[in-house]
Design a protein with these regions (language model features):
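Generic recognition of stable, solvent-exposed alpha-helical segments in well-folded globular domains
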Residues: 80, 84, 110, 135, ...
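A short alpha-helix capping/helix-coil boundary motif
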Residues: 91, 145-152, 250-253, 358-359
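Non-catalytic, mostly N-terminal accessory regions of nucleic-acid modification and defense proteins
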Residues: 1-119, 181-194, 287-290, 308, ...
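Conserved, well-folded catalytic cores of nucleic-acid-processing
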Residues: 64, 68, 88, 92, ...
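Short, flexible coil/turn micro-motifs enriched in small/turn-prone residues
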Residues: 94, 98, 127-129, 153, ...
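Conserved S-adenosyl-L-methionine
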Residues: 101-205, 210-214, 219-226, 237-238, ...
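Signature of N6-adenine DNA methyltransferases within the class I
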Residues: 161, 192-201, 208-375
């Protein structure tokens, strides 16, 4: 639990908002909070007293935040409101950044929610070794709360390479009241694993796509490469094996990868993928719609790998893989960004649960979902692209004879031509009146 001393509480800051020292007062509050909460040491910003910051605007911002009515209702307690505000600004910054690393610290909420809803982390140890700003942990805690559980039922472990992003994650979780072990510092998960002995019940992650400069010579014979040494020019299958290495004997991982990982044979990736399938680790693959991410148009898929496919609490799924093609779902919310609705997410997660659970009532849906055997995957040379397996979408039967349809459509087309000529005449007439 985080403790805020009296001199750092919001009322104290608001009472001093009009004083010339407001910048120093905010910085002092940050110092006090860090002193009382060692897990936040070195994380909070202390630059509000700097010369270039307009103190009048800072005072107005303090008053504006102070005017928000934080009421401890069941649905909107203070940490929920502040957490959502923080998440909103993370999303806004991610959307406005440019360059190849733009928005890399932020996974869109609908993607995170899909992963969490499919995994259902009710309790246990949750790990994200490339945690960005901590969105996977926030959504996991919200999932537990939404299902009537206690957030303390999950233990959160994370790691982040970029120092600034690591600090964002620490602040994000602190605002939400979520205690987490993100290590004492930022660090590279491959060369400096901060949780080497952790075996998690759930791994939830969105690793950076197709990283080419990840390799270090000391990783050559790393014990994590059980299924093959990843190519030095692409970290995708290094991440996959890192996730599997950190799973408990009954653990499950859900993560995002670029679609190339489903079919690539570069640098031995095909052999690694084959061994993962043959080891019966791959549980489900979901092709996601395009344009879900701020920072890349690269199409992505969700992978679910599990060491728990022998019926412990779920249906025995040995020798099976579920493929879901969700590329047609979602709605464009801006010219270049798509989001999945709650209904879309429920459809994807519900399909997975129906297949995975006892008496789930699962049936294949042509064009959307199909349960496939390892033998069939072998025939496709261990390519895991869902479109190869789910088939085509069923269409409603059309009883109109082809010849009759051609006549009808031709007549409709000629009618449209005639209407076009009439409209052209009206436009020319009105334009003539303007000259």
């Amino acid at each position: 639990m985080f403790w805020v001393p009296a001199e750092a509480r919001w009322q104290h800051i608001q009472d001093r908002a009009k004083l010339p020292s407001i910048g120093q007062d905010v910085d002092a509050a940050m110092d006090l909070i860090e002193k009382e909460n060692p897990s936040l040491r070195g994380v909070l910003p202390r630059n509000y007293a700097r010369e270039g910051l307009d103190k009048t605007r800072l005072a107005k911002l303090v008053d504006l935040i102070g005017s928000i009515g934080f009421t401890e209702t069941d649905d909107h307690c203070a940490d929920d409101v502040l957490g959502r505000v923080y998440e909103y600004f993370l999303g806004q910054f991610a959307g406005k950044e440019t360059g190849k690393d733009a928005g890399a610290f932020y996974t869109p909420r609908s993607v995170v929610k899909t992963l969490v809803e499919m995994l259902e982390p009710y309790e246990g140890r949750v790990l994200d070794p490339c945690c960005g700003s901590g969105g996977m942990f926030v959504q996991s805690a919200e999932f537990v709360k939404a299902h009537g559980g206690n957030r303390s039922a999950i233990s959160v472990y994370g790691q982040e390479f970029t120092d600034t992003t690591w600090k964002l994650a620490k602040m994000n979780l602190a605002l939400r009241g979520i205690e987490a072990n993100l290590g004492e510092r930022s660090a590279d998960s491959f060369t400096d694993d901060l949780h080497p002995d952790l075996r998690a019940d759930y791994v939830i992650a969105n690793p950076p796509f197709n990283v080419s400069d990840w390799h270090n010579p000391k990783l050559a014979d790393d014990p994590r490469w059980t299924y093959g040494t990843p190519p030095q020019g692409n970290a995708n299958f290094a991440w996959v094996q890192h996730f599997i290495y950190h799973l408990s004997p009954r653990g499950t991982a859900g993560f995002v990868l670029a679609n190339g990982s489903l079919s690539s044979k570069t640098g031995g990736e095909g052999e690694i993928r084959e061994r993962l399938v043959q080891a019966d680790l791959v549980d489900c693959i979901v092709s996601m719609p395009p344009n879900l991410f701020f920072n890349t148009p690269i199409p992505v898929s969700l992978w679910f790998v599990s060491k728990d496919r022998h019926g412990n609490g779920h249906r025995k799924r040995v020798g099976e893989v579920l493929f879901i093609d969700a590329r047609k779902l979602g709605t464009m919310v801006t010219r270049r960004l798509r989001e999945l609705s709650d209904e879309d997410i429920a459809r994807i997660a519900g399909t997975y649960h129906a297949w995975r659970n006892h008496d789930g009532g699962y049936v294949d849906v042509p064009g959307f979902a199909r349960a496939t055997t390892l033998e069939e995957i072998k025939k496709h040379d261990f390519v895991l692209t869902p479109g190869r397996y789910v088939g085509t979408e069923e269409v409603e039967a059309d009883d109109e004879p082809v010849a009759d349809k051609i006549v009808r459509l031709t007549e409709e087309l000629y009618a449209e031509f005639e209407r076009g000529r009439e409209l052209e005449g009206v436009v020319r007439e009105r334009l003539g009146g303007l000259i």
